[in-house]
């Protein structure tokens, strides 16, 4: 039987304890023991994440641990064991043990029980167990449930701790006891502790009280209220949600025991903190320092007492005595108000005195008291600011007079050769001083006196000898001209007006020493040299007679150097100059005095100028065009002489322009078989130029033009040469492509085929005859013309498939027909097709007509027999029957024969049979057509190749007498298909 112990886990409340909290596992349903087969949902809740997130679950059972992960914080389980969870970045939770019991009776209890909770214990039984309504605590009967399954603890407290179980009876067997559940009631929060910002505050200072506690993690959402007390008196307004209480000022009367209470809402659980003593501290007052004897003349050796006293009594006070801020002595006294020290006066005891009193709450100083010890002055000492015997004119000298001993104030007097100079009074130690600038008259003996009321004391005399330093020298040139040429001789003169001998002169050029000379008296020295270009610059001289050199004003010397022959450099952004590039002409004379004016030339024509004020080089920029090819030079001039550079040649390459592609053919319209010339030419561009020719972006070939200009490429045209053409020009800089040019190669029309189409077997006056003309080859648009006996009937245009012309037949329409096809490249004429329109004679009446009709019927019968025989023979020969099922209905209509004239297609061999029934004057000729296909037959439109009508054609009507109107017959030299 499993004993389950509920663990207490605390969470921080009000920020008192900072630590990383563990997540908590919550159960649904809330029981730790359930029957096997039931499910329990575990929820992992953390206190630093507020939305479900990826969670790890650890399940340990019988020594084995299984790790699972869920995308959220929920896991549904059915297995017994110990479960823990871990959210991202959190520690592992405390373990929760679940028991999926196979017992017939179980007692269910919640995972955690806290003081003040309403607790339900549920006794559940399987079907074969009957409850006896008894629940036990620590094996003692606790209650009879009277058939109820739940036992309620309305307000849990520590007395409810114990082991609980319930009992029942198995049917026809024995008593059954449930598992034992151990209940341990936990406090929802820890006992509070009172904290104070200070337990020994100084009187008048504020204090903050804090009631610290921790809520259990399972009860972290339970609100707490707080109440603060001093002794048994409530502070403030009573219960508050804040764990802090502010006392704005603490006084001595506020000392006492302080404590606090924390309670859950609605005050079901209340806990008191321990009591803490707060002692208000009173700091010492400012002490008073007194001297004794008072107002006495304090000579050296007199005994003086200093007394320091406060106004309040303290358990212990530390007194300290100070002289000019330096500690002298200290005394610690108990329950006394003051302390004293005594000493005999010396000269060092003069000054300010004060004391401090400290009772542990900070030292408080007294006001300062001054003590003056009277001492006669000693002989003063006179000092100069410089120990040197030689003092130069203009220097600043300080005389310092000081008596080493003597009471203040002291009156000091300075003297020069017995004459009083100046007097000064000193109220502090250190003496006095006077300063002045020396002249030659200040040479002589000096002394000083000191007097503090007991008679003046005189110092020893000090001698002062004033030396005159040299004045600023003046540097001059031998020539007043500012411009001096290379090779000339120049003399520098350096001279001073005043100064004690001996004087050292030094000459400098740009701070570099040139020459020096020493003279025993005031005057000047000179220095000469021949000029070179390097002598340009600033010159000065110095004069020194032992008191530091004096420097003259700077004199500038400019040595003018003629310019040398300049060097011209051409700079372009690439190895070869190209139109559009920025050309920099760089001209530089290696030697020559500035400023230098540079001129730039192209083919001796001035481009421009540029000045170099400081010497060196100059540049001139050009944006290149084709005209900039040629010779360049530059010139340098600094006013003395002009120098011309060598000539440099520049060749400017011109990128090819976009080429133009043109077609050159023998006629306006390109025709199959023509020789086409493709001419490509770039109007601009440096040679050589390589031309590429393209048809539908496929390279046809390339041709080079070494001297520029255009290039041509020839083609013998076929129908495949229709399409888009372009060309490309490239002279090594950048290839340029022409615009696309479309070429359409025209095909001349072939010889057309003329076909006559009538609605019946015999053409009769009034029938609608269709003349169809078609050229099997030829570029559209094709114009078809129709002719009857070479007389134009009409014309039709057609892009494809031929054209037709309809005629309503009359007797005059018999004769020869032809057609012509023309697409602008030459007309082609079809072969002639003959059309006969005939009829019976006028005396076709009575018996004769009947005889003729009978004869015609006989002939028709013979013709039908011949047709059947011909079809049978055709089948035996493997030819397609006339009634081919693949034909369309229009193709099988025997009433719409079609007549063609197809040149070189089939050779027809007619067999003629005359039919002249009863000797009448109308003779019919029967034509049997024998078709012999030639190997070189020309293909035609499939619709013209179908078999239409009977293979027997009445090709000619011979009239023996005057024709009469009647049925019409058609004859054609074209084969019947």
From Swiss-Prot:
It holds the Pfam family Ig_2. Residues 883-892 have a biased composition (Low complexity). It is a single-pass type I membrane protein. The chain crosses the membrane at residues 852-872. Residues 23-101, 188-271, 287-374, 380-463, 473-556, 566-651, 659-744, 752-834 form the Ig-like C2-type domain. GO terms for cellular component: cell surface; external side of plasma membrane; plasma membrane; receptor complex. A motif (ITIM motif 4) lies at residues 952-957. A motif (ITIM motif 1) lies at residues 897-902. Residues 879-898 are annotated as: Disordered. The keyword Repeat applies. Residues 16-851 are extracellular. Keywords: Cell membrane, Disulfide bond, Fertilization, Glycoprotein, Immunoglobulin domain, Membrane, Receptor, Repeat, Signal, Transmembrane, Transmembrane helix. Gene3D superfamilies: Immunoglobulins. Residues 873-977 are cytoplasmic. One of its GO terms (molecular function) is coreceptor activity. Changing residue 687 to C: In a breast cancer sample; somatic mutation. The keyword Cell membrane applies. A motif (ITIM motif 2) lies at residues 910-915. One of its GO terms (biological process) is single fertilization. Contains 2 copies of a cytoplasmic motif that is referred to as the immunoreceptor tyrosine-based inhibitor motif (ITIM). Plays an important role in B-cell response to antigen that acts both as a negative or positive coreceptor. Inhibits B-cell receptor (BCR) signaling in the absence of CR2 stimulation but engagement with CR2 and the BCR lead to a superior calcium response compared to CR2 and BCR costimulation. May be involved in B-cell development and differentiation in peripheral lymphoid organs and may be useful markers of B-cell stages. May have an immunoregulatory role in marginal zone B-cells. May play a role in fertilization. It is linked to A chromosomal aberration involving FCRL5 has been found in cell lines with 1q21 abnormalities derived from Burkitt lymphoma. Duplication dup(1)(q21q32). Interacts with CR2. Interacts with CD19. This is Fc receptor-like protein 5.
